[in-house]
Amino acid sequence: MTRSDTRIAWRTGWIAGAVAAAAFLLAAAGTKAQEKPATPWVAPADARAVKSPLKKTPDNLKAGEETFKENCEVCHGPKGDGNGPTAKTLTIKPANFTDAALMSKETDGSLFWKMSKGRGAMPSWEDQLSDTERWQLVMYIKTFSEKKKE
């Protein structure tokens, strides 16, 4: 290899490294721009006032648990603590349903509205799950903070 070849190889390597570093920095900057603090997610007053039409029964809780496992656990985790396998990839972290202070602010109606409408990575479930399935899910989600109190 001649001296000229060595210089060309060195320049090519240096340029490739600089391009890779610039691409990494641009990607990181783009990610940081998306990591704005989440604005509070509050259901409208009329939605908050809605009461569940279902009674808390073992069958409804079991159905809610199954729906949770099939649709929610991947983000909210098996314990409902917001630490599901995909949670670390999300900019806005999933709700921690074991947090009694957080859950005390949520009415049945607000939880139903939030899961129906979705936001960001949280999908809207109103076209995928029936009203009954979503109310059963609300019922089950509330058990996570109740378990923590015990």
Whereabouts are the PLM-identified features?
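Electrostatic cytochrome c docking/interface patches
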Residues: K36-T67
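N-terminal secretory signal peptides that target proteins for export/translocation
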Residues: M1-T12
